[in-house]
């Protein structure tokens, strides 16, 4: 690719999926430019690495580019897309550029409705600790690396495979993980769950005959597609029939301790693991990483060490520490990207396990009106399990409002359910101050959502420090 393409332009370069690919291409020596609607820490990091960054979109930004890369959030009438089309510059989706990178490595693609980012990060950590130095492109900032992407010297490229727009069907990995299959982004699949399942089967069929599918059979929908997978297969889970399973699981001080059990040359093998993450759902994510590591020939001791040393990924049960409250005492702040009822329930269970006997305060910003509408009753159920609830207005992600699927409607439904009295916060900017007024000594406050609520924990910490002073 390099002898024909020198300059690659990204429209929407600040996005987490786009920025990772851009960073790897910069390291490979390509000229990278890009635009986004606003500057951010991500665009500043890319600029420091040598990318030419434009704030805002304009036709002239694509001048000199050999190819233009777009994310699914970029519309066809974007001025840079239109200028590239008029100039005959190839326009490729993000997933296609990731597929090009994967052609030069042995691709390991992590798919599934929930857990992709954490699992991808754990795989990268385990393979790195085993000396395999993988390249990775992750949908979140890996704390140890300070970035969501890195070019490694090894043979493997570990990346998330996105089913939300079916773009994972562009990829041709050598190994693939499916963590679970759940109803989300159903507009892509005509609101037909069977079509969604078939897409995962088609994704796995893109593996070569010598490849490896690593599937979580604790998930009933993943188990349902097993008969249709015709590639070499490794299963993982907590169930006794899994090829790689966890035994003797116990939570200790925010970590999960367990024994991993697997077969090797007909003999049962067992090794203790200390996972530096809370929650049984993260035990499953760790099992996927172990299965991949074993398939890559890594030593189980090195794999386990990588899981123990794992320092987390941004916005995945990210701990901000304790804040001082204006009325005295302290509260612990944790932030998480969860925005689907299933992953929210898993994260809330992890929080209960990590902080037993403490009041759990959830500040949640729903993401997309369509998701809120389609999963309304599920949201009411999971939101009713916390001790105190603050609800922000829906983050639209480009969608128009839908009647009876906004934050107020959700708050009313939770109130009617009668298990918790929600506080509705219309302006996300008011959430930190409202939280401080609500918090009590010893509380754990968990901010959750995929939208602008990600800025709330930092602002809460700053505001608390100002008021405490």
Swiss-Prot record:
Keywords: ATP-binding, Cell cycle, Cell division, Cell shape, Cell wall biogenesis/degradation, Cytoplasm, Ligase, Nucleotide-binding, Peptidoglycan synthesis
Residues that hold ATP according to the record: 112-118
Reactions performed catalytically: UDP-N-acetyl-alpha-D-muramate + L-alanine + ATP = UDP-N-acetyl-alpha-D-muramoyl-L-alanine + ADP + phosphate + H(+)
UniProt KW Cell division keyword: yes
EC numbers, comma separated: 6.3.2.8
Pathway in which this enzyme or protein is active: Cell wall biogenesis; peptidoglycan biosynthesis
Pfam families the UniProt entry points to: Mur_ligase, Mur_ligase_C, Mur_ligase_M
UniProt keyword annotation of rRNA-binding present: no
GO terms of biological process kind: cell division; cell wall organization; peptidoglycan biosynthetic process; regulation of cell shape
GO cellular component terms given for this protein: cytoplasm
GO molecular function: ATP binding; UDP-N-acetylmuramate-L-alanine ligase activity
Record's subcellular location: Cytoplasm
InterPro entries documented for this protein: Mur-like_cat_sf, Mur_ligase_C, Mur_ligase_C_dom_sf, Mur_ligase_cen, Mur_ligase_N, MurCDEF_pg_biosynth, UDP-N-AcMur_Ala_ligase_MurC
Enzyme kind, highest EC tier: ligase
SUPFAM superfamilies found in the cross-reference section: MurCD N-terminal domain (SSF51984), MurD-like peptide ligases, catalytic domain (SSF53623), MurD-like peptide ligases, peptide-binding domain (SSF53244)
PANTHER family xref list: UDP-N-ACETYLMURAMATE--L-ALANINE LIGASE, UDP-N-ACETYLMURAMATE--L-ALANINE LIGASE-RELATED
Function field: Cell wall formation.
Family according to the record: Belongs to the MurCDEF family.
Name of the protein in question: UDP-N-acetylmuramate--L-alanine ligase
Species name: Laribacter hongkongensis (strain HLHK9)
Lineage: Bacteria, Pseudomonadati, Pseudomonadota, Betaproteobacteria, Neisseriales
Protein's gene: murC
